[in-house]
Amino acid sequence: MPNILSLTCICFNSVIYPTSFFFAKLPEAYAIFNPIVDFMPVIPVLFFLLAFVWQAAVSFR
């Protein structure tokens, strides 16, 4: 039961403050990884596009 309550609170807080979820800043010690972290959401899209390139290479068998 406490797990469900805490999950509900987390979801409720993310609804109230949606910008803090998308624009969170890394701690200063990890600031050098900012470019990598900014690029990470694009990686699944690249795999999706790679599937089409691969299928085109094998003539969509």
UniProtKB/Swiss-Prot annotation:
Residues 1-24 form a propeptide. SUPFAM superfamilies: Photosystem II reaction center protein K, PsbK (SSF161037). InterPro entries: PSII_PsbK, PSII_PsbK_sf. The chain crosses the membrane at residues 32-52. One of its GO terms (biological process) is photosynthesis. It is a single-pass membrane protein. It is found in: Plastid, Chloroplast thylakoid membrane. PSII is composed of 1 copy each of membrane proteins PsbA, PsbB, PsbC, PsbD, PsbE, PsbF, PsbH, PsbI, PsbJ, PsbK, PsbL, PsbM, PsbT, PsbX, PsbY, PsbZ, Psb30/Ycf12, at least 3 peripheral proteins of the oxygen-evolving complex and a large number of cofactors. It forms dimeric complexes. PANTHER family: PHOTOSYSTEM II REACTION CENTER PROTEIN K (PTHR35325:SF1), PTHR35325. Belongs to the PsbK family. This is Photosystem II reaction center protein K. It comes from Oryza sativa subsp. indica (Rice).
